[in-house]
Every structure is written in structure tokens, then in C-alpha cells.
């Protein structure tokens, strides 16, 4: 069966959204994502549909306080690095989706913050303070590396990920949408058309921490 992606190939942008540094996500925006874990053969099948997309390597460094205050308050923070730039992101759960706060960083500055286990002044620290988190000490938990294929489709921004952390490799499909209910229906239809069985996908941070505890 021809998938929704294949049917709408003329409407796709055949390059990763992260290839263009001018397309950095808004400093603050509501992220509504649908996702499923994939088997390796399902991942390979879907990758064939991302024709012309250049994959982007991104490294996610997860950060918390030494006593895991962020995890306790159910917020997540990371520095994500790309080939020549980086960003600091805070995710705060909402009734639907996560509110994201993003600060663009120069790659060298990001590397310095990571080596010193520190974070820069700005939007993210200000938002943390609103949640009662004003730590002077930070801890880099480790790194999860993702090879991402990303493109805009008729049903939303789709990302196909292969992630590695500790001794784990997993595969995941994400769809970022504007409307949760409509997006959920279209995502399910896409999975059915591609004969993919839905597997609940905890966040990358949750998967990372679980493996960290078991390592």
C-alpha cells in the first residue's frame, strides 16, 4: 500500500529542517508530538521513504542537579549539539504536549558549558527559577546520540531517529502536529498503511536514565 508520505511526495521538503541554521525552533513554543518505537526492519522500510533527506547527527547531553531536582519536578533539560551550532532546551509538561524553551548557543560555548557542567544565563534559567529551581550546581548525566532524518509531510513534521546510548540502539518515529486529536488519527493511519505496530515510546531522556541505572 502506498503511504501518506509517498502520496504527498510533491509537498515534501527534501532536506532536514536542521540543515538550515535559520530554521532554529522558536525560543518558546508548544511541542505536540506523537511517537512510536520501531523495530529495525520497520525503521529500514521507513528510511526508504525519506528520499533525498540528508540525515543530521545530533548529540543530546542531559542535565540535572546532583539531587535530580528537575526530574523530581518532571521537567527536562538538555544541550543538543550539531555540526557547527548548539541549543539549550528546557521542556515543561503541559496538559497536552510540552512547552519548550530554547536558547541558541555557539558550539564552542556549548562545549565549554558541558565541560564545566554549567548553563548560561537567559531564558532557560529564568524559567527554571519560576519552577523554584535555582541550583548553582549542575550535573551532565551523559550523552545520547541520534541520527535523524526529518521532513515536512502533509500530516506534520516527521522525524525518523536511530539513537545510541550506553550499549543500547533504538529506533523511533516522531510526528510533530498542531492538533493532537487530528494528529493522533492521522499518525495511526500512517502506521497502519505501513504495517507498523504501535509501541509506546517513553521520552529519550526516560530511556536514557533507565539504561543509565542498569549500566
Task: Describe each PLM feature range.
Residues 13-215:
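Phosphate-end processing signature that detects enzymes handling 5′-triphosphorylated RNA
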Amino acid at each position: 500500500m502506498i503511504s501518506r508520505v509517498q502520496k504527498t511526495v510533491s509537498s515534501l521538503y527534501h532536506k532536514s529542517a536542521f540543515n538550515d541554521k535559520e530554521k532554529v525552533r522558536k525560543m518558546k513554543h508548544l511541542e505536540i508530538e506523537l511517537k512510536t518505537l520501531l523495530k529495525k526492519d520497520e525503521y529500514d522500510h521507513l528510511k526508504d521513504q525519506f528520499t533525498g533527506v540528508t540525515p543530521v547527527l545530533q548529540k543530546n547531553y542531559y542535565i540535572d542537579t546532583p539531587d535530580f531536582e528537575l526530574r523530581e519536578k518532571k521537567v527536562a533539560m538538555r544541550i543538543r549539539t550539531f555540526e557547527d551550532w548548539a541549543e539549550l532546551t528546557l521542556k515543561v509538561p503541559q496538559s497536552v504536549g510540552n512547552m519548550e524553551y530554547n536558547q541558541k548557543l555557539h558550539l564552542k560555548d556549548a562545549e565549554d558549558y558541558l565541560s564545566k557542567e554549567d548553563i548560561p544565563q537567559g531564558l532557560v534559567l529564568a524559567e527554571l527559577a519560576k519552577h523554584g529551581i535555582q541550583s548553582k550546581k549542575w550535573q551532565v548525566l551523559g550523552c545520547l546520540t541520534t541520527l535523524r532524518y526529518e521532513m515536512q509531510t502533509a500530516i506534520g513534521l516527521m522525524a525518523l531517529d536511530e539513537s545510541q546510548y550506553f550499549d543500547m540502539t533504538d529506533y523511533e518515529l516522531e510526528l510533530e502536529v498542531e492538533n493532537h486529536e487530528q494528529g493522533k488519527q492521522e499518525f495511526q493511519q500512517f502506521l497502519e498503511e505501513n504495517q507498523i505496530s504501535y509501541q509506546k515510546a517513553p521520552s529519550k531522556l526516560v530511556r536514557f536514565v533507565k539504561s543509565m541505572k542498569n549500566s
